[in-house]
């Protein structure tokens, strides 16, 4: 299985969600969209355990099945189509989440998240399993 992690689930993982850790260990590929990396690092800078959290992130990123996804021109096209789709439906989602959805669709991944607003993107494969 090929998955992408949303920020809330990466946070859960770093807070010791062993069920999620086990599930991710069974995945062939685990991707972090660049926006998730930025959001998680912003949280570190505002938190009281910055050093601990940065160590957790580094140890996660060196796993052979884990990678970072970067937007490309194709991602921008996916973003634009989704933006118009959601605007016409009157159901926008936050900008970073729109970028995340575009990357996940572009690479045909399953998004592991707790954010229900991703349901507004029906073509997006989602996994809402949570603690």
What is each PLM-predicted segment?
Residues 6-7, 40, 79, 104:
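Generic structural signal for small/hydrophobic residues in well-ordered secondary structure
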Residues 9-10, 75, 99-100, 117-118:
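Alpha-helix capping/helix-boundary segments
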Residues 37, 53-57, 76-79, 97:
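A general structural signal for well-ordered alpha-helical segments in protein cores
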Residues 1-36, 42-59:
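Short, well-structured N-terminal submotif of metal-dependent ribonuclease cores
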Residues 101, 105-131:
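Acidic, PIN/NYN-like endoribonuclease modules and their adjacent C-terminal/linker elements
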Residues 47-51, 86-87, 128-131:
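Short, hinge-like loop/turn segments at secondary-structure boundaries
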Residues 67-112:
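Active-site neighborhoods of divalent-metal-dependent phosphate/nucleic-acid chemistry enzymes
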């Amino acid at each position: 299985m090929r998955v992408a992690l949303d920020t809330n689930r990466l946070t859960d993982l770093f807070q010791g969600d062993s069920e999620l850790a086990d599930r991710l260990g069974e995945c062939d590929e685990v991707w972090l969209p660049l926006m998730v990396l930025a959001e998680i690092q912003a949280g570190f800078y505002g938190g009281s355990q910055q050093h601990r959290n940065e160590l957790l992130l580094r140890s996660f990123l060196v796993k052979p099945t884990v990678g970072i996804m970067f937007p490309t021109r194709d991602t921008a096209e996916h973003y634009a189509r989704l933006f118009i789709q959601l605007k016409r439906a009157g159901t926008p989602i936050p900008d970073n989440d729109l970028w995340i959805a575009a990357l996940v669709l572009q690479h045909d991944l399953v998004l592991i998240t707790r954010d229900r607003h991703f349901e507004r993107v029906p073509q997006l494969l989602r996994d809402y399993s949570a603690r």
